[in-house]
Amino acid sequence: MRGSEASGPGAIFGAPSTLTTSVIRNPTSFLSSSTPLPSTDADVVAQNVEHVLLSLTSHNDGGLVGVSGNSSGSTGKGILIGVLSAFGSATVAVLVLAIFFFFKYTRRGRIFLDRIGRPGEFDDEQAFAREEAEALEVMDDMSRSEYMRAKSFVEANPPESMQTDISLSQFLAIQEKGVSAWEFQPELEIANCFVEGRTEIEFYDSECSVQTNLPVPKQNDVYYWEAKIYEKPESTHISIGMTTKPYPLFRLPGFHKTSVAYLSTGHRRYNQPFSATPYGPPLAQGDVVGVGYRPRSGTIFFTRNGKKLEDVVHGAKTQNFFPTVGANGPCTVHVNFGQMGFVFIEANVKKWGLAPMTGSLAPPPPYGSEQGSILLESGRESAAQISQRVYQDARTNSTVRIPPSRSPGPVRSPTDISLAPLAHIPSHEDVGEGSSHANTIADEQTPLLNTSDLDQVPPPEYSSPDGSRRGSDITGDLPNQNSPPIPSYDAAVGNQADNTSTPDGDH
């Protein structure tokens, strides 16, 4: 194919270019050489051919323009779709955030008669009043009086009305003692339970509860503690859970606001004094009940003998909960805050105790191991030296001084003024105050006794000889006045010289 033929309009649409070129150059010859058409004029055919060629040419140019227009239109549509999708995503995100913050900050304005999955929580005061009226009609006099007493206490002391956050001194005590900083403190006015060893609680015949001195911390993800029922008669009901302060401790936990408990009957109570909700198996002697608290979500759950039960409380993030145990009869409950291993394995592995087992305060050393301690060793040495010195003084000093007997009555100083008649004291006997002189004379005349004589008691058959000192007076102890005088040093030296010179004179 030649270049002129390739560049013809037939090359664009794939038509034979030679035929098209020949028709364009000499359309009349093409028509004359072809088969004659019936009743067709040559001019009309030529006009039709020209019209076809013009239409083909115009169609080719328009096709090129259409292709470029379609490509530019598709690009614009893609950009528009991307912008609209971005704006749509942003709008959806803003709408979701608006709904979230709306429900978060308007929760107090909503009223739920029954929250999902947690029946028995009253957010409507009218519903609570109706429930209260129905329950008071069927209560006996004792139960009604106890409930009204607790209601008065709650109205006078609303929950969380006192400061219960862990103070700096309590935090330092936890750092020093560890989990030993927690202990149960019974109410002295009730005095119906006895706490032994910080965590061993013994209840008596009437209804009461006991709380810990410190609340559950909120630094970790989960905190957990367990209570084991050591002794429980069939008629005694035990309630194990958590409460806030102040709380009426003459009532069981779970019966009033901001308290939750697992009852030994197998029910649970959450701010519910009238009706209990079935929760788990009943509790018997030897069972272990665990209480877990998640501060970040405000969730409280229970376990029984190492098996986790469903969550009871949700959203209690601002309250300070205190571990609480209550009973209405004689029983014994031992509580484990983390000083021992838990029955719940997950809490054991993840160390969900209230605090570490040991704090920074070292325990006291055992008896008999004072070595290495300067203070204890020095104290032991000083005590040994003092005891040895006293023993030596008792051995060397054989006499003791017996003080004179004093007359009964108050001891008066020499300067005391009394209205009693004074005895006449001659001036030559006492120049100053006579009492001091009399005391010195009495001290000088105090007899001395031998300690060995006091200790050695003679047998009944023994009789002291006549020349012995026993039974003699004080003059026997004095030296003999007729004995020769003791020679001086010079006289003794002179006598020795005379004795040495006498043998020489004999020779």
From Swiss-Prot:
It is a single-pass type II membrane protein. Glycans are attached at N397, N450, N499. Residues 385-400, 496-507 have a biased composition (Polar residues). Residues 385-417, 448-507 are annotated as: Disordered. Residues 401-414 have a biased composition (Low complexity). SMART domains: SPRY. This is Protein ssh4. It comes from Neosartorya fischeri (strain ATCC 1020 / DSM 3700 / CBS 544.65 / FGSC A1164 / JCM 1740 / NRRL 181 / WB 181) (Aspergillus fischerianus). The gene is ssh4.
